Amino acid sequence: MYKRQVQDYLETRRNAIEGYSLPKQSLDHITSIDLTLKGGDFEILYVSGAGTDFTLDGDYSVATSSFTQNGKWTANIWANSGTVTLIIPRDSTSFREIDIACTQSANLFIEDNLSADSIKLSTQDGTLTTNGLYAQNISLHTNTGNISASLLESNLGQCHIQAHTNGGPVTLNGTSLVQLNEDGSGTALYDNRYDTETQSYRL
């Protein structure tokens, strides 16, 4: 009975995955990105000279993928084995929002500087590492996972940063923002202050 249930689930998932692919939209039509990454290792490259289309490489399954008229690409991607690489082409287009959620033990490494008006990164129980972020608003959230992010020095004083944890650590530029210990001590929420005298944010 249990074996039949598993087979039915796998068949249902396989049918749901068929027919979906990455958007064949040129970069200047995509202004917001909303990704849910699941089940394995991912890396995101944000590079010049990659053309106008998004590229996804590796052993993956796209459970859902949609593109709306307001320029938002939403996708739900599973990593089946190995590392799955998503290349986001860089050109003069500016993203309004980038929202990436890592769930079900997914790990993510963002190699290049990621830029948008607003960036939201979250992880459930995996590890998320970035080499550089540039945004007006940055939100970092973890459940029991680990987030290690870096912010470009030129953006430090102009960025509103919020962080939240249910246990795991969140660090930014080597500074611990939030972490809860086993006894419940520590800091669960972080929101940097805006200094009216210097008209800038403090990390």
Regions picked out by a protein language model, each given a short descriptive name:
Residues 113, 118, 128-203:
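Short, surface-exposed interaction patches in beta-rich subdomains
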Residues 6-74, 78, 83-95, 99-101, ...:
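Short linear S-[DN]-x-LW-Φ motif typified by the pepsin-like aspartic protease active-site region
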Residues 5-7, 25, 69, 104, ...:
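Residue-identity detector for glutamine
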Residues 33-37, 100, 121, 140, ...:
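Active-site alpha-helical segments that house and flank conserved acidic catalytic motifs
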Residues 1-2:
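Short, small-residue-biased leader/transition segments that mark boundaries at the very start
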Residues 98-132:
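Right-handed parallel beta-helix
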